[in-house]
Amino acid sequence: MGEIKDLAEVHNLVSDIFHYPKTAEEWEKYKLSDDQVSHFHEYGYVSGIKLLEEDQIEVLRKELAEIRDPNHPGHHLFYEFHSNESEDSNSVLFHSLGHWRISKAFHDVLWNPAFVMAAHQLLEYKPVRFWHDQLFSKPAKHGGVVAWHQDYSYWTRTVAMQHLTCWTGLDDASTENGCLHYIPKSHLWGLLDAPSLAGDMNGLMAYLTEEQKAEFKPVPIELKKGYGTFHHPLMVHGSYENKSEISRRAFVLNVFADGTVSNTDDELLKGVPPIPKGKQMQGKFFPLLYKNK
């Protein structure tokens, strides 16, 4: 396959998988409705957003299969790579960060116009800057859990809290194969302690008040492949095992509003040069994805 270029060097589309709009009129078709934006702010999430076409899904699936190989020549560019992060010896949960640096298609989903426009709206029309990506793959029959958690509990090394997460399926996601579940309005609970992400599904319960436990009513987010769901950084969410006959492959894009700053002098992602505490998140690894048109 030859030497792999670090695609973090390029802050625009590198393939023809997406068409980037050139006019305000072209952007219009990607906008969320007012009702969708209101749902996000009231409940902490908005789901059922079409982000990918069938041919784009196929390209991403193909590139996912390639980069999952630990012998891939771009393997050293991952921030994290866990062929199995599950703490259950009978389950498998593939999880990685940093594949946008390796795969053209996973690089270009950062600039998917349907994604960046929705993110811009949900971040209250602020410019959108990239934080990091994730891949989660649960194989058929023995896919592991992702425990209940809030994303920002792992991200306090960046401030202010003006982050956003988008989860997109490369397979149909159902309760049978381990789809995402949300606790509606839990984004109003404040910041909770961070449990082990691939450990006990209910580890977070130890940190909840009796009132929060009473409100803990999971809602499954079943989605067709190519559709996404956006959630607030304090949204409590997780996903159960995959006991079905089909895999559950998905990627996650995490972003924040431009102007977010580092809250540590340590490295923010493995192998990424530190950004001094108080300095703005920007540069090679944190590209600006969308600003006001």
What are these regions (language model features)?
Residues 2-43, 49-148, 154-155, 195, ...:
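Non-heme Fe(II)-dependent double-stranded beta-helix
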Residues 16, 173-236, 260, 278-279:
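Double-stranded beta-helix
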Residues 67-70, 125, 173, 189, ...:
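Phosphate/oxyanion-binding loops and surfaces in catalytic or ligand/nucleic-acid-binding neighborhoods
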Residues 151-156, 216-218:
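Short, P/G- and charge-enriched loop/turn segments at secondary-structure junctions
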Residues 156-175, 222-223, 230, 254-258:
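Short, conserved beta-strand element in jelly-roll/cupin
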